[in-house]
């Protein structure tokens, strides 16, 4: 692990030079390739140092962080074109990548909390510094207050566990099981529920997505939402008994909330808001599967987290490509694109079909195992799951049909069909999404 952390840290010295944007992007992809070679089939923590280690759960999410950060730099070519504080932008992204690697490889609960919160700072600066509308200040405040307010009880919970067990190490604590500490259970999981985000505490997400630049949206949808799921996977190892007692509450809220959010998607007119709300619906089903605490549920939630990271990041990339051409995110203006961006319509179709879990995407594998686990937990959930699956397909088709079909907006007179760079970014989102299903033991057999 240390070699990758040092590689990323030494990239910081490049920021004193000019014209190093694409070099940094190439270095991040080089680090990704080196990290891919390092795949271990070790289901326990390996590469252990004093505070850092890596197992199969963290491996997939660190790899996703590397991949998405490389693609963010490819997608944000506008920053270089307009020379919009390029080196500061690079610093934010590389610092965010470093924080994410630290978060996913922390073995101490307190270190995990520290880096979990630190990843918020560069995200906030990305939204405030490179966002488009003046409302980004409000979005930044929403993001900050929701996550910080929910995280304070987590800190108290961590110190309580330290006091009780004399350790904060995940491995040591996995042999413990906490009983009769209902308030501690709420303290420990509430921060992760907000980060996921669970329905009812999801209001910061659409705001943050709509105001963020393309890089902010990609990392937010791709990796930062997964921090919540990762935290729950780690914390539930010491809260199984309390989970059996209370988890039905979160499953009910998530499934009913998922259906309601899917309905909200159907009357969205903003491309980015629609994709952001669809993220909330997907994370609802991930959360439900996680809370069943079954083998299928945990594996399925992890698989869908990785699949959703690639898929929704690609969709935000597509929305940005349209926004750069049209100057608007409205579906009333971004319509009839099949007429003047036909080559891009293929990518819209492929990523939309991934979003509604069509085969052979990784989303399908995740959703099938999640459906299995949630239905085995209770037959009643079939009702809301049926609605969720149906509306998920409905709003994705609505997005595709409205944006690609119909008459062209009459105000458009000149259009660039798309550059090789944009097609490459989209292909690098779509390829792993469809190829990973061939190597699904990487996602499914880590328990």
UniProtKB/Swiss-Prot annotation:
One of its GO terms (biological process) is ATP synthesis coupled electron transport. The keyword Nucleotide-binding does not apply. It is found in: Mitochondrion membrane. It comes from the Eukaryota. Keywords: Electron transport, Membrane, Mitochondrion, NAD, Respiratory chain, Translocase, Transmembrane, Transmembrane helix, Transport, Ubiquinone. It holds the Pfam family Oxidored_q5_N. GO terms for cellular component: mitochondrial membrane. The keyword Nucleus does not apply. Its EC number is 7.1.1.2. GO terms for molecular function: NADH dehydrogenase (ubiquinone) activity; ubiquinone binding. InterPro entries: NADH4_N, NADH_UbQ_OxRdtase, ND/Mrp_TM. It is a multi-pass membrane protein. It catalyses: a ubiquinone + NADH + 5 H(+)(in) = a ubiquinol + NAD(+) + 4 H(+)(out). The chain crosses the membrane at residues 28-48, 56-76, 85-105, 110-130, 141-161, 183-203, 213-233, 246-266, 273-293, 301-321, 343-365, 380-400, 409-431. Belongs to the complex I subunit 4 family. Core subunit of the mitochondrial membrane respiratory chain NADH dehydrogenase (Complex I) that is believed to belong to the minimal assembly required for catalysis. Complex I functions in the transfer of electrons from NADH to the respiratory chain. The immediate electron acceptor for the enzyme is believed to be ubiquinone. This is NADH-ubiquinone oxidoreductase chain 4. It comes from Aedes aegypti (Yellowfever mosquito). The gene is mt:ND4.
